[in-house]
Design a protein with these regions (language model features):
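Short beta-strand-to-turn element immediately C-terminal to the catalytic PLP-Schiff-base lysine
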Residues: 17, 30, 74-76, 150
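Divalent metal-dependent hydrolysis catalytic cores, especially in the metallo-beta-lactamase
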Residues: 67-69, 84-113, 125-139
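Glycine-rich phosphate-binding "P-loop"
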Residues: 71, 139-151
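Histidine/acidic residue-rich metal-binding segments in metalloenzymes
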Residues: 42, 150-158
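Distinct, well-ordered alpha-helical segments
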Residues: 111-114, 144, 154-157
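Short amphipathic alpha-helices and their capping/turn segments at secondary-structure boundaries
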Residues: 46-55, 113-124
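Histidine-rich, glycine-flanked metal-binding segment
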Residues: 2-10, 15-58
Length: 158
């Protein structure tokens, strides 16, 4: 448990969104870049410097379907580095966790995307991989290329 005396930075936003509520007058205690204390009733002593912030602080966003970002599409560049570039592009808008998404494509592209995601997961906000297709309806495939739509088979499951 972190004590108030251990906190090295105090932040008082004008509004803070947390746990489904908008808080006014909340104070955050930050240590080593991580929020340690969140309270609405702490009296921060004059010995502590408080940074007043005129804006909203909220938890980072989690995006469960991210095909690309920063000029990179996962289907075109199924590598760990591309996944990190995609995450970096989304992070500047408040997204702290993503599921990079690969859509219906060749077995080779899907396999490389899976391998890249397995290397990247747990780093830079990569939570896993969203595989969209290829086992979908040809008639309702939308933007997915028909030549890559296929039924599920035992080889794919292995």
């Amino acid at each position: 448990v972190t004590e108030a005396a251990d906190i090295i930075q105090w932040i008082r936003p004008s509004r803070l969104f947390n746990e489904g509520r908008l808080h006014i007058g909340a104070v955050l205690g930050v240590l080593n870049g991580r929020v340690q204390i969140f309270t609405e009733d702490i009296q921060v002593k004059e010995a502590h410097q408080v940074m007043d912030f005129d804006g909203i602080i909220s938890p980072g966003f989690v995006d469960l379907q991210v095909n690309g970002g920063g000029g990179v599409l996962l289907n075109e560049t199924p590598t760990k580095e591309a996944i990190w570039d995609i995450a970096k592009a989304h992070r500047k808008y408040g997204t702290t966790g993503i599921l990079p998404t690969v859509i219906t494509d060749s077995v080779s592209v899907l396999s490389r995307a899976v391998d890249a995601a397995m290397e990247a997961v747990g780093q830079n906000g990569i939570l896993g991989l969203h595989i969209e297709g290829p086992h979908i309806s040809v008639e309702r495939r939308g933007t997915h290329k028909a030549e890559f739509v296929r039924p599920l088979d035992e080889d794919t499951i292995r």
